[in-house]
């Protein structure tokens, strides 16, 4: 092949590449123009304001007006340089050099996402974040090419119309800062009793780091996470040359509580609604991608205000339950068994009215639900998969080791009943038959069955026959009152599992609306659900759940008690009597399912004596209120 031929081939290839390149640019440009043609118009009023969201109960009565609580806007000349440096350090290093979009950041994020297989994440400038907060959903599923194009287009437009100082001011006044505070000046006054200009570098660094996850980095509810985030901001400030090494060392060694004052209540709603509203906020964001704290909307929920108020009264007075002390905690969830509507939920006793959307133990999975796991992990799968054919099947309560080990399984009383019926094993909450049943079912089948009831483990073990303990308890894995109430609802509802639903309708600011409901999915055969209910009726009438029994009300349920390890008892508990870290009761009627957890915030503070009866009594008091004027009747096949 001569030199001229090679040159012709090279020229041909170059022309082809150039043609493809030009075509790609034209196609991309056309697609970009199509996307941005549907972008909303820039509006200073929207950049400045945060419209409040109104929340209604299941009778369409207003229960909260969120977003209207506190707002003190900072003027541009009131914003300290250290705050600006902190914000750009953690959010947008090249903020003062780009014009709305950062091509270097886009290329870096693209390479990271290609390596990690992720979506269009990590490339947003501070200007784009402001646009997103003002106009768009923050849901990961909504980070589409169309949305990204519109976001970039509006960011470039905003940079042409506003100065960098104005954009920063919009952002500083726009962001949600937890506990009902909107804008960093509002947070400064609420948390420190000072204006922004009077705060120290570590205090400003904390505020600068909060907007990405304001409730998670709340220094009152999550001081450790807040300190970690603050220190990351300080590290970035040092790396960018905004503070010296000496200033950095001094700042990171400043306690996160330095200067914090007691919170004053800013809530426009009663304290008994706080936990429920937190879950409403989360579900709205899961379903729509919008944060109702920064996006105006009307949300219609499933909470029954009267039931929620009664649950609060049961927790916080001695009129219904005699508590052993003020420190014993309770967390519970009540769902409608037919559609999963959460009609009431409360995560603690004696909650502070000064904290908004704090930890809600009712949805946390960090405590062990003990023997309440037996119906859903062991016995229901055994009936479903034909391991046992009736409630009268014989099981063995005799010396037995966890499969594949030399570790014995003990019953709570360290004794054995011999051959007993399946019903009696569940009624008396015997551990040995439960673990042996799980072995017969098989771990894989049990895990699949649990998944159908909304419960999962990173990996399931034979110990999970009588425990919900898991290596990861981040609400995804393990059990909570929310998860257990919904799981047991499937027994009450003929085997149909309903997803817990807090919201039923949203009306957006543009007048459009969306309804939310869950028709449920079949988790087990109707016969399985009926046999499980038949067995668990005897738990209340004759077994471990007699404290929840109401002779006039057809209901079923299961008690649960977790255990300390021998090491914990020897080194920490040092109590020779019967003690436990957690006591639970999960029960249901044909209409409602309720799960109750009791225990101390410090797990090493044991439940003793009468404390073991609190969970059943809370359930009994609530079910009496729910059913005495609305008798749900009995189950039939």
From Swiss-Prot:
Cellular component per GO, a single term: outer membrane-bounded periplasmic space
Annotated GO biological process: cell wall organization; peptidoglycan biosynthetic process; proteolysis; regulation of cell shape; response to antibiotic
Region named Transglycosylase: 62-224
Residues at the catalytic site: 91 (proton donor), 371 (acyl-ester intermediate)
Known pathway: Cell wall biogenesis; peptidoglycan biosynthesis
Residue ranges, annotated region (Transpeptidase): 298-612
Protein name as catalogued: Penicillin-binding protein 1A
Species whose genome carries this gene: Streptococcus oralis
């Amino acid at each position: 092949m001569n030199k001229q031929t090679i040159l012709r081939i090279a020229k041909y290839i170059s022309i082809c590449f150039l043609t493809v390149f030009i075509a790609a640019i034209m196609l991309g440009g056309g697609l970009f123009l199509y996307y941005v043609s549907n972008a909303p118009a820039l509006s200073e009023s929207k950049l400045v304001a945060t419209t409040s969201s109104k929340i209604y109960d299941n009778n369409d009565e207003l229960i909260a007006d969120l977003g209207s609580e506190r707002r003190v806007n900072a003027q541009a000349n009131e914003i300290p340089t250290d705050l600006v440096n902190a914000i750009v350090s953690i959010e947008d290093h090249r903020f003062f050099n780009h014009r709305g979009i950062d091509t270097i950041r886009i290329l870096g994020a693209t390479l990271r996402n290609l390596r990690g297989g992720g979506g269009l994440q990590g490339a947003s400038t501070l200007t784009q974040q402001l646009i997103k907060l003002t106009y768009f959903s923050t849901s990961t599923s909504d980070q589409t090419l169309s949305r990204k194009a519109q976001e970039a287009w509006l960011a470039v437009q905003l940079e042409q119309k506003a100065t960098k100082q104005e954009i920063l001011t919009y952002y500083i006044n726009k962001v949600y800062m937890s506990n009902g505070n909107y804008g960093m000046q509002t947070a400064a006054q609420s948390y420190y009793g000072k204006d922004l200009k009077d705060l120290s570098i570590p205090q400003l660094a904390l505020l600068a780091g909060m907007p990405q996850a304001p409730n998670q980095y709340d220094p009152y509810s999550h001081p450790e996470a807040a300190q970690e985030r603050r220190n990351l901001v300080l590290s970035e400030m040092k790396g960018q040359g905004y503070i010296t090494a000496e200033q950095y060392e001094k700042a990171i060694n400043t306690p996160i509580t330095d200067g914090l004052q007691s919170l004053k209540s800013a809530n426009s709603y009663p304290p008994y609604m706080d936990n429920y509203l937190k879950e409403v906020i989360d579900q709205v964001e899961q379903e729509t991608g919008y944060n109702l704290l920064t996006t105006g909307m009307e949300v219609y929920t499933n909470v029954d205000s009267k039931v929620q108020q009664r649950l609060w009264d049961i927790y916080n007075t001695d009129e219904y339950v005699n508590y052993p002390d003020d420190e014993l905690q309770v967390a519970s969830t009540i769902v409608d068994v037919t559609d999963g509507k959460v009609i009431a939920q409360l995560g603690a006793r004696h909650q502070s009215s000064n904290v908004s959307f704090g930890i809600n133990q009712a949805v946390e999975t960090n405590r062990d639900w003990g023997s309440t796991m037996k119906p859903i992990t062991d016995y229901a799968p055994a009936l479903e998969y034909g391991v046992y054919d009736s409630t009268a099947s014989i099981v063995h309560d005799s010396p037995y080791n966890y499969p594949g080990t030399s570790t014995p399984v003990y019953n709570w009383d360290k004794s054995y009943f011999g051959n007993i019926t399946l019903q009696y094993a569940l009624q008396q909450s015997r551990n040995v038959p439960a673990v042996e049943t799980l072995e017969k079912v098989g771990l894989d089948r049990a895990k699949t069955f649990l998944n159908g009831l909304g419960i999962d483990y990173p990996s399931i073990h034979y110990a999970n026959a009588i425990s919900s303990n898991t290596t990861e308890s981040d609400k995804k894995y393990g059990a909570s009152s929310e998860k257990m109430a919904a799981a047991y609802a499937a027994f009450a509802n003929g085997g149909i599992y309903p997803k817990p639903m807090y919201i039923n309708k949203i009306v957006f600011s543009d007048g459009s609306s969306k309804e939310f409901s869950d028709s449920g999915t079949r988790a087990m055969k109707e016969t399985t659900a009926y046999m499980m209910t038949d067995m668990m009726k005897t738990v209340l009438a004759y077994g471990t759940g007699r404290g929840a029994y109401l002779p006039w009300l057809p209901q079923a349920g299961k008690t649960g008690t977790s255990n300390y390890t021998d090491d914990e008892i020897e080194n920490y508990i040092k109590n020779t009597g019967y003690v436990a870290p957690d006591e639970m009761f999960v029960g249901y009627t044909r209409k409602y399912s309720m799960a109750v957890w009791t225990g101390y915030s410090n797990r090493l503070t044991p439940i003793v004596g009468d404390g073991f009866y609190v969970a059943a009594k809370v359930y009994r008091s609530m079910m009496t209120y729910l059913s005495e004027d609305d008798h749900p009747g009995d189950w039939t096949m």
